[in-house]
C-alpha cells in the first residue's frame, strides 16, 4: 500500500491505504540537521562509535585461493608500509567445493587433504594445481587467523546465504523439499 503526506494551508496530513493507526515522532530542535540528530539521540540514545580500525583500509578481492596467498597479501602490505586494517576471505565455498561453505571450513588445501581423492573430487581445477606447490606454511584456519592477527590486521570471512548443489546442506534440504525454487550460485 501507499502512504501519503500533504502539507498545505489547511494543515498537514498523513494517510495510508493500509494502516488504520500510526504513531509519529516529530523531531525538531533548532531547525538544523544537527538539531534533528540531537533530537533523535534524545529519543534513542547516542550511538556507540565503532573501533577506529573498522574505519581503516580493508583489502578484499574476489577470493584468495589459499591461506598462504592471503598471508602473502598481508606480508606485502607490511613490506610496502601500506596501512592495512583488515582483509576479507571471500566466497571460496562457492562452486563445486562441498567441503568449504557457510557450515564447514574444510577446504582440502587447508586441512592437508590435497592428495586424498575423496576430498578433492569436486575441487576446482585451479585449486588442484596447488598440489605441486608443496606444503602450505599455514596448515589450518586457526593458524591463518593467528597469522593475520599477529601482523596487526583483522580478518573477515564473507559468508553468502548460498550453497552449491554439492554441499551436504543442499542435499539434505532437497530431500525435505525445503529449498526455495530459484537458482543459487552456481
Where would I find each of the regions flagged by the language model?
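Catalytic-domain carbohydrate-binding cleft regions of carbohydrate-active enzymes
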Residues: 1-186
Amino acid at each position: 500500500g501507499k502512504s501519503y503526506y500533504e502539507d498545505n494551508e489547511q494543515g498537514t496530513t498523513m494517510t495510508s491505504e493500509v494502516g488504520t493507526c500510526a504513531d509519529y515522532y516529530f523531531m525538531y530542535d533548532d531547525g538544523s540537521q544537527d538539531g534533528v540528530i540531537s533530537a533523535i539521540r534524545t529519543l534513542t540514545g547516542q550511538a556507540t562509535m565503532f573501533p577506529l580500525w573498522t574505519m581503516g583500509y580493508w583489502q578484499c578481492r574476489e577470493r584468495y585461493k589459499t591461506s598462504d596467498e592471503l598471508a602473502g597479501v598481508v606480508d606485502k602490505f607490511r613490506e610496502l608500509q601500506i596501512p592495512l586494517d583488515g582483509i576479507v576471505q571471500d566466497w571460496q565455498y562457492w562452486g563445486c567445493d562441498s567441503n568449504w561453505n557457510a557450515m564447514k571450513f574444510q577446504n582440502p588445501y587447508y586441512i592437508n587433504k590435497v592428495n586424498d581423492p575423496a576430498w578433492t573430487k569436486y575441487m576446482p581445477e585451479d585449486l588442484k594445481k596447488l598440489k605441486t606447490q608443496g606444503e602450505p606454511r599455514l596448515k589450518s584456519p586457526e593458524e591463518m587467523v593467528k597469522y593475520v592477527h599477529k601482523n596487526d590486521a583483522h580478518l573477515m570471512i564473507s559468508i553468502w546465504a548460498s550453497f552449491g548443489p554439492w554441499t551436504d546442506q543442499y542435499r539434505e534440504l532437497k530431500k525435505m523439499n525445503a529449498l526455495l525454487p530459484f537458482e543459487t550460485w552456481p
